[in-house]
UniProtKB/Swiss-Prot annotation:
Its cofactor is FAD. The gene is mnmC. Its EC number is 2.1.1.61, 1.5.-.-. It comes from Campylobacter hominis (strain ATCC BAA-381 / DSM 21671 / CCUG 45161 / LMG 19568 / NCTC 13146 / CH001A). It holds the Pfam family DAO. This is tRNA 5-methylaminomethyl-2-thiouridine biosynthesis bifunctional protein MnmC. The keyword Phosphoprotein does not apply. GO terms for cellular component: cytoplasm.
Length: 667
């Protein structure tokens, strides 16, 4: 890369990024003008682009939406994203409106999807990666496509027939194509993909450029049984459940202009697992490239942005966190992560190799829910019973309460979500008998502060930094255990699971290089506590009859201040359940042929229960993935591009267990 007379030149492609004399004028003439006509007739516009480059097309088009109530969703794909410093140098020479804001929000250059909330009515999705691969991970219908890569002769891969075919799949009927190119190869490729091509005068003396309009069909869709729903609806949203998932979902929809109501059966928010004294915001760490781990990375980055923007600093401390690889399986996961935007692996840490999670946070879940609840309409004492369709919407019934009406119904019931699928203590419905979902009991323990640590620490159990005169450790994990009362032996299990992090070797020698205070020293605060337990003596056994633990090394004089039981929802594959609920009878009838490759129904769209969605089964990391769940539901309801690659959206789809069952030929 080099600048020639203030214009960036790419030495690999031997081409400039823009016109010499008037880069903004060129952007407006070729690309921005294509938006003007649509702006007259539409309140929502989806613009997609191949080649973000310097961002001039985005900034030019975004300026048209400034001080407007119209909504712009701009998706841009870039294989070779530029460093922020290069963008800044270019903007110094050419004053672009919004350039400073873009620089402030510009993401790291890690491949993948990056969502930027540019303003209240403008969203920018930057998709970094090879266009052919990235396009396959997209699902939306654009109003306009901007083809702004290097010239076809210098970068033929970006103008291939496969790329054009994917663009056609992502176009609504009569969508526009705008490009500076007048290449016959580009024209033919567009025509073969179903576009009507016309040539118009080019910019600044260039003879011609292409305009095209989509009149064809989208072709075959891969994994058509996961195709997104497209419902029209009113603006009344009813959410069942006032934990973190329900609260954040309500906030998201309220910010989009929907009228939201939350129905909660308890007398307060965060009555279940979201009600803990404190909790850790961090992703689940898998081996690099595993879809579950990739989903958690996206969720984590989105959650960090959300809490930093919306939550008071006293309720969210972004201090980082450390996880220790206490067995070989975890070590194998950790060592696949080099130093990156999120992780920093340290093989030599004590008592085990560790991974430091940058921007992990110590959160106050209950207080966060209470903080948001002040802005929401929440009806307490409303225990969901059932619902019936009525005039295109729903009448939802509750135990001992008057029914509520809504256009959109969202379930965010946490561990009690299993009751919607024929399970749990109080079966309410059975939307899908193939669903794999269960409730897991977890007990946390509050102690008199015993360890001075500025960050959460995790191994078999986890320790949070002290808050005031309390320090939290946790948490047990017992599937299908519905006991509400705290149990002494569970407190003892929690103590046993953190004991190895509290011996003298750990306190003196564990790595502190990632801490904000480089001189910080871990310290045992309670001198009466003997935590000097060796690795060899960590084994213990549970006496199933009397429910007590026998320790080989006694932990002495621990002051337990209290305990709390919460229940978490888990799915059978550990992915949350986020999306539209399927019409199971339709799936079973239409997709029973899935096991046989021949005669497979191509593009037979799925059918969903109209405007009924779910955001649940977030397990132990609901503080992280619940934010992603709310964003995806907003994507679905507003029919905007997804914030995640489609392959990950499919992994989260509530219909996935039913589809897997049908693929095996099971009924």
């Amino acid at each position: 890369m080099k600048f020639i007379n203030g214009i960036l030149f790419n030495e690999n492609f031997k081409d400039f990024y823009s016109n010499f004399k008037n880069p903004f004028g060129e952007s407006e003439f070729v690309f921005g003008s294509a938006v003007n006509e649509i702006l007259k007739t539409q309140n929502r516009v989806i613009v997609a682009e191949l080649g973000f480059g310097l961002g001039r097309n985005f900034l030019n088009i975004a300026a048209k939406f400034k001080n407007s109530d119209k909504i712009l969703h701009f998706v841009s794909i870039e294989k070779f994203p530029l460093q922020k410093e290069i963008l800044a140098k270019f903007y110094e020479n050419f004053k672009f409106e919004g350039a400073k804001k873009l620089l402030k929000l510009y993401p790291t250059l890690e491949s993948g999807f990056h969502r930027i909330k540019f303003s209240k009515n403008i969203t920018l999705d930057l998709l970094f990666g090879d266009a052919e691969c990235v396009l396959k991970e997209c699902e939306f219908k654009a109003d306009i496509w901007l083809m702004d890569g290097f010239s076809p002769s210098k970068n033929p891969d970006m103008w291939s027939d496969e790329i054009t075919s994917q663009i056609a799949r992502l176009c609504r009927i009569k969508a526009k194509i705008a490009t500076y190119s007048a290449s016959k190869k580009v024209q033919k490729s567009l025509e073969n993909a179903g576009f009507c091509v016309v040539k118009t005068p080019g910019f600044n003396g260039k003879r011609e450029m292409i305009r095209a309009y989509f009149n064809g069909n989208s072709g075959e869709i891969k994994d058509y049984f996961f195709e997104r729903p497209s419902f029209k609806s009113g603006k009344n949203v009813l959410i069942i459940g006032a934990g973190i998932a329900g609260i954040v979902t309500a906030i998201k929809f309220q910010n989009l202009g929907y009228k939201t109501v939350i129905a909660e059966k308890a007398c307060s928010v965060a009555a279940n697992a979201s009600g803990n004294f404190c909790g850790v915001l961090e992703p689940l760490i898998t081996k690099k490239g595993v879809k579950l781990g990739e989903m958690h990375k996206y969720a984590f980055k989105m959650a960090v942005k959300f809490y930093k923007k919306n939550v008071p600093k006293n309720l969210a401390k972004f201090c980082g966190a450390k996880e220790f690889a206490y067995n070989d399986d975890i070590l194998k996961r950790f060592e696949t992560h080099d130093k990156s935007e999120i992780f920093d692996f340290n093989r030599k840490d004590l008592p085990y190799a560790s991974i430091f999670i940058k921007n992990a946070a110590l959160l106050r879940p209950r207080k966060i829910c209470e903080f948001f609840s002040k802005k929401l309409n929440i009806k307490f004492g409303y225990e969901f019973s059932d619902f019936v369709e009525s005039n295109g919407g729903y009448i939802v019934n509750f135990v001992g309460k008057k029914p509520l009406k809504c256009d959109i119904l969202i379930f965010a019931m946490g561990s009690e979500s299993e009751e919607l699928f024929g399970g749990g203590k109080n079966v309410r419905a059975n939307f899908d008998d193939a669903m794999q979902i269960s409730s897991v009991r977890g007990q946390i323990t509050l102690l008199r502060p015993f360890l001075k640590t500025p960050i959460p620490l995790g191994a078999r159990g986890y320790i949070c930094p002290k808050i005031g005169k309390r320090q939290l450790i946790g948490a047990t994990y017992d599937r299908k255990d519905y006991e509400n009362q705290a149990r002494t032996f569970d407190d003892e299990r929690n103590l046993q699971n953190v004991a190895e992090l509290l011996n003298k070797n750990f306190v003196k020698n564990t790595d502190t290089r990632n801490l904000n205070d480089k001189k910080f020293k871990f310290e045992i605060l309670d001198k009466n506590v003997d935590f000097n337990v060796s690795k060899q003596n960590l084994n213990f056994k549970m006496h199933t009859q009397n429910k007590e633990l026998a320790f080989k090394n006694q932990i002495l004089n621990v002051k337990i201040l209290g305990s709390r039981v919460g229940f978490r929802g888990y799915s059978g594959d550990r992915f949350p359940l986020i999306g539209a609920l399927p019409d199971c009878e339709y799936f079973k009838e239409k997709y029973k042929i899935l096991p046989w490759q021949k005669n497979r129904a191509k593009n037979l769209p799925p059918k969903y229960l109209k405007n009924i969605y779910i955001n649940t089964s977030h397990g132990a990391r609901g503080l992280c993935t619940a934010i992603l769940g709310a964003e995806i539901l907003a994507d679905l309801v507003t029919n905007r591009p997804f914030c995640l690659p489609k392959s990950l959206i499919n992994e989260l789809a509530p219909s996935r267990f039913l589809i897997r069952k049908l693929k095996k030929g099971l009924k």
